[in-house]
């Protein structure tokens, strides 16, 4: 069992190093990965702040700090939700759309570089697919929920 644990930890270290997860300037854009992930979700149409928080499994304090930082940079603006003023909807500003596109280009380039170093590319991609599926399944729960709530909206896209 210790060997399995050591292998998982080795894998975790390799991935976090490879993708720059611990860099203070993720992909050289002067913000950490957490803020970049929030920007990414908003850029892909996930504006409900509670749903973003649920998707990234962030506590409310960290979510607020990340969102406030993006707002202070002029990349994101928030508005009250039209159906519930206690909730907020985030959207990219014009500068935020440019930054989102820059991250998309840099992320694609990073993926291209990683794949370019792989001799057994198809095997690596199959392993990545398997891991993404297995790790995603581990987060699935079956429970009754408000169909208008952030968890339901996240599942229904």
Language model features with spans:
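Terminal interaction helix/tail motif
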Residues: 8, 101, 105-150
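N-terminal helix-turn-helix DNA-binding core of bacterial DNA-binding proteins
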Residues: 21-62, 67, 73-75
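Short, solvent-exposed linear motifs at loop/edge-of-secondary-structure regions
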Residues: 52, 75, 147-155
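Short amphipathic alpha-helical segments with heptad-repeat character
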Residues: 2-5, 9, 57, 97, ...
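N-terminal leader segment of winged-helix/HTH proteins
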Residues: 1-33, 142, 150-156
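Short, solvent-exposed beta-strand edge segments and adjacent coil->beta transition regions
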Residues: 55, 87, 137-139
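Charged, amphipathic alpha-helical coiled-coil/dimerization segments
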Residues: 68-125
């Amino acid at each position: 069992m210790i060997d399995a644990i050591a292998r998982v930890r080795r894998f975790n270290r390799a991935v976090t190093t490879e993708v720059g997860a611990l860099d203070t300037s993720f992909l050289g854009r002067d913000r950490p990965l957490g803020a970049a992930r929030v920007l990414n979700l908003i850029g892909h149409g996930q504006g409900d702040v509670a749903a973003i928080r649920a998707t990234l499994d962030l506590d409310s304090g960290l979510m607020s700090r990340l969102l406030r930082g993006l707002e202070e940079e002029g990349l994101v603006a928030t508005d009250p939700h039209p159906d519930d003023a206690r909730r907020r909807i985030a959207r990219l500003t014009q500068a935020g759309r440019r930054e989102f596109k820059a991250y998309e280009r840099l992320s694609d380039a990073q993926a291209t570089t990683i794949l370019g170093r792989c001799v057994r590319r198809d095997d690596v991609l199959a392993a990545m697919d398997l891991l993404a599926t297995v790790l995603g399944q581990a987060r699935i729960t079956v429970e009754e929920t408000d169909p208008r709530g952030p968890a339901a909206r996240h599942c229904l896209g």
